[in-house]
């Protein structure tokens, strides 16, 4: 089926067809059309709902158990959602009880582990509910050849990114991978973020972490996200570092190969007409 011709009077319509971004909305007088205004309000409501949606850790734990994956439930020092939103520092550290739980687990399982995966609600529990299991499935498939010892999956209520460093340190983990709901956008209320740290410990800054963002069906695919993360993990083990000194070369190779095989599908890469 042929694509409809581009309206020469409004070339923005062709770009609008290729992106969920709010472009080419039209106008009614000096204002937005009613449809565009209602869509904006609906997207804003979705983003707010995603921020305040409670983390259904019980359902996620049950699904992990069905896949023979043990899990631990912990809580940050933020006692509730309001505290979490108003005091970001409390979301970066464990509650006293949760820290003690991890110490007891580490004493019962001495020797440390290579990898601990932490799942936190962050600013979008919706992202965690939708994407955690599909992503972990692809990650486990691709890392089956790597003989890394793993801790139980750690589920954290009211958690922020840096809390993974404390968890990794208490468990004696060589690597920590944090899966966390990202701040909702007006076109993406369910983006999952991945944060990787080698040799985690309390006090590390973002410079020591690698981030893979926008993991969702309309963004970065589960398989590609797992591929990029595994590249970082293997390189981190080889070079014994992470963060700004560890570049994601896997991304460059993938983009180059896609550009060579699928150039015609990308309007930005199409050659100009003769």
Curated annotation (Swiss-Prot):
The protein's required cofactor(s) are namely: adenosylcob(III)alamin
EC number(s) from the headed UniProt entry: 4.3.1.7
Gene3D superfamilies reported for this sequence:
Ethanolamine ammonia-lyase light chain (EutC), Ethanolamine ammonia-lyase light chain (EutC), N-terminal domain
Residues that, per the record, bind adenosylcob(III)alamin = 161, 182, 211
* GO CC annotation terms, alphabetical: ethanolamine ammonia-lyase complex; ethanolamine degradation polyhedral organelle
Mention one GO molecular function. Answer: cobalamin binding
Any matching Pfam family? EutC
Q: Which UniProt keywords apply?
A: Bacterial microcompartment, Cobalamin, Cobalt, Lyase
Tell me the compartments it is located in: Bacterial microcompartment
GO BP term, example:
ethanolamine catabolic process
Q: How is the cofactor bound?
A: Binds between the large and small subunits.
Q: Which domain of life is it from?
A: Bacteria
Please list the reactions this protein catalyses.
Answer: ethanolamine = acetaldehyde + NH4(+)
Pathway membership of this protein?
A: Amine and polyamine degradation; ethanolamine degradation
* Chief place of localization: other
Q: Which HAMAP family match?
A: EutC
Q: Its function?
A: Catalyzes the deamination of various vicinal amino-alcohols to oxo compounds. Allows this organism to utilize ethanolamine as the sole source of nitrogen and carbon in the presence of external vitamin B12.
Q: What is known about its subunit structure? A: The basic unit is a heterodimer which dimerizes to form tetramers. The heterotetramers trimerize; 6 large subunits form a core ring with 6 small subunits projecting outwards.
Protein family (similarity comment): Belongs to the EutC family.
Q: Which PANTHER family does the record match to this protein?
A: ETHANOLAMINE AMMONIA-LYASE LIGHT CHAIN, ETHANOLAMINE AMMONIA-LYASE SMALL SUBUNIT
What is the protein name given in its UniProt record?
Ethanolamine ammonia-lyase small subunit
Task: Supply the source organism's classification.
Answer: Bacteria, Pseudomonadati, Pseudomonadota, Gammaproteobacteria, Pseudomonadales
């Amino acid at each position: 089926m042929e694509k409809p011709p581009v309206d020469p009077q409004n070339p923005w319509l062709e770009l609008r067809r290729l992106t969920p971004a709010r472009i080419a909305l039209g106008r009614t007088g000096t204002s937005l059309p009613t449809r565009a205004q209602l869509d904006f309000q609906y997207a804003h409501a979705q983003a707010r709902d995603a921020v305040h949606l409670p983390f259904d850790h019980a359902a996620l734990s049950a699904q992990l158990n069905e896949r023979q994956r043990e899990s631990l439930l912990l809580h940050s020092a933020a006692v509730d959602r309001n505290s979490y939103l108003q005091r970001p520092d409390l979301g970066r550290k464990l509650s006293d009880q949760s820290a003690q739980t991890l110490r007891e687990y580490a004493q019962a399982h001495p020797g440390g582990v290579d990898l601990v995966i932490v799942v936190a609600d962050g600013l979008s529990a919706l992202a965690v509910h939708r994407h955690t299991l599909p992503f972990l499935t692809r990650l486990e498939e691709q890392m089956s050849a790597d003989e890394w010892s793993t801790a139980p999956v750690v589920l954290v209520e009211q958690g922020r990114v840096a809390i993974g460093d404390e968890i990794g340190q208490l468990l004696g983990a060589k690597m920590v991978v944090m899966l966390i709901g990202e701040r909702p956008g007006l076109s993406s209320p369910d983006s999952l973020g991945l944060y990787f740290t080698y040799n985690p410990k309390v006090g590390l800054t973002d410079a020591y972490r690698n981030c893979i963002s926008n993991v969702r069906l309309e963004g970065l695919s589960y398989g590609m996200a797992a591929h990029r993360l595994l590249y970082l993990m293997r390189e981190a083990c080889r070079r014994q570092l992470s963060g700004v000194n560890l570049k994601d070369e896997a991304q460059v190779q993938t983009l180059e190969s896609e550009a060579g095989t699928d150039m015609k599908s990308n309007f930005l890469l199409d050659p100009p007409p003769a």
